[in-house]
Amino acid sequence: MKKKYRIKKNDDFQKVFRRGKSFANRQFVVYTLKQEGSNHFRIGLSVSKKIGNAVCRNRIKRYIRQSFHELEDQINPENEYIIIARKPAANMDFHEVKKSLIHVLKVGRVLKQKPNNSK
């Protein structure tokens, strides 16, 4: 995922927190805010120091970014997303992280239907 599709600035984070909707499961909280006219979604990641050391936090962020990259064609391109990892995410492998993100995005009705020709 390209860096221009990431949310980095505090003002952008606060805008999504204040105006957006939130959805959660045990591992992740997802805030989403619709941005009219955007041609690609943006994501911001937050992983607290309570979750683990830097290696653990960076691994979780890599897993989340890769999951969004693989789900790119199913995600609404007009939204901005903030993903906050919770403590149970520290012990998960990539496939568990992806499955959990799919679950929370379905709860929020953010994912489009899977194309029939996909694997």
Swiss-Prot record:
Catalytic activity, reaction form: Endonucleolytic cleavage of RNA, removing 5'-extranucleotides from tRNA precursor
Family note: Belongs to the RnpA family.
Subunit structure: Consists of a catalytic RNA component (M1 or rnpB) and a protein subunit.
Pfam families: Ribonuclease_P
Enzyme Commission (EC) number: 3.1.26.5
InterPro entries: Ribosomal_Su5_D2-typ_SF, Ribsml_uS5_D2-typ_fold_subgr, RNase_P, RNase_P_CS
GO MF annotation list: 3'-tRNA processing endoribonuclease activity; ribonuclease P activity; tRNA binding
Function as written in the Swiss-Prot or TrEMBL entry: RNaseP catalyzes the removal of the 5'-leader sequence from pre-tRNA to produce the mature 5'-terminus. It can also cleave other RNA substrates such as 4.5S RNA. The protein component plays an auxiliary but essential role in vivo by binding to the 5'-leader sequence and broadening the substrate specificity of the ribozyme.
UniProt key word Protein transport: no
Keywords tagged on the record: Endonuclease, Hydrolase, Nuclease, RNA-binding, tRNA processing
Highest taxon of source: Bacteria
Biological process annotations from GO: tRNA 5'-leader removal
CC per GO annotation: ribonuclease P complex
Main enzyme class: hydrolase
Protein name: Ribonuclease P protein component
